[in-house]
Amino acid sequence: TQVYAFTRFKYIIDFSGFSQLDKMNLDDIEFQCNGIASGIMLAPSGLIFQIRDCFISQPKDRGITSIGTGCQGMLVDRCQFLSNEGQVRAQDRTSIAFNTNGNDVKIRENRATQFRHFAVLGGSGNLIIGNHWFQGDSETQGLRLAGIVLAQTNVRTTVVGNYIDNSSIGWTNEYEAAPDFLNQFSFGGLTVTGNHFMAIDVAPSFKWLLIKPYGAGHFVQGLNVSGNVFRCTNGSVDRVEGVDTSFAPLDNGRMRNVVFQGNGFNGVTQPSENPTLFEVNQATAAATWTALPGAVLPF
């Protein structure tokens, strides 16, 4: 049993009175929220909403909110999202730059400062390219939250060429009403390539890629993490990827097509690699050789 509270935020521009809104374009506008209002609420349905070359400054709660599928195919290009919570500890922030529920969203060349999350993406088919979001604070060994939250398992999402600063990629199936693995696709379809991952003054337990299954039986069946740079300063982190087992672990016996290769690691105690090369010494003839690669394999 859970108890839910619902809060209706106030927005500078509220399109929720439209039943459907297609091909709307906002260009070269500064939304001065001043910690009093949120930015933009989308219509409950629609296609190809575009916002480009805009500033959304100091939103109280949300920069852009999708309450339905008005974000289907949304384009967010070259915008700046400036938080009202820059002086607040990362774990105490509540504002989110934007969320989506629909598919095929393109997020390109944006900059976002010190929100709780940069993006909460409920759909699949996302292209996240060339952005810089940073979420640090002044704490020593501080906590860091997800910059991007992917809220379904088979995401068909590409994260390429971003500067991911003091935040992580969080991957959950939180939106599933029945979160246990049955006959759906499990966690897969994610490509993370050519990004700069940075962390400063974080706890050693921090991970840049964190999977959190909300039900039992899930596994990873299609993940490519390659050509990235991971760097931690003013301390080190144990490793770059992990699983939050608060609700359930992953089924490692069913993992397949998980690639970690060509990445650079600085300030990381245990780098991850798959496929990996290591030496096995077998002293006597045997039908079965046991190979123990240790902690180098992901997850």
Language-model features, listed with the residues they occupy:
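Beta-strand-rich solenoidal segments
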Residues: G227-C232, V237-V240, F247-G253, N257
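Extracellular beta-strand/beta-solenoid scaffold signature
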Residues: F6-G17, C33-A43, Q58-C71, S83-G102, ...
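Right-handed parallel beta-helix
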Residues: Q2, D22-C33, L47-Q58, C71-G86, ...
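Short, intrinsically disordered, charge-balanced linker/junction segments flanking boundaries
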Residues: T1-Q2, L297-F299
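Glycine-centered flexibility motif
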Residues: T1, S95-A97, G123, G235, ...
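Extracellular receptor-binding modules and their adjoining Ser/Thr/Gly/Asp/Asn-rich linkers
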Residues: T158-G161, F181, T191-M198, W208-G215, ...
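Serine/threonine-rich low-complexity intrinsically disordered regions
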Residues: A5, D14, N25, D77, ...
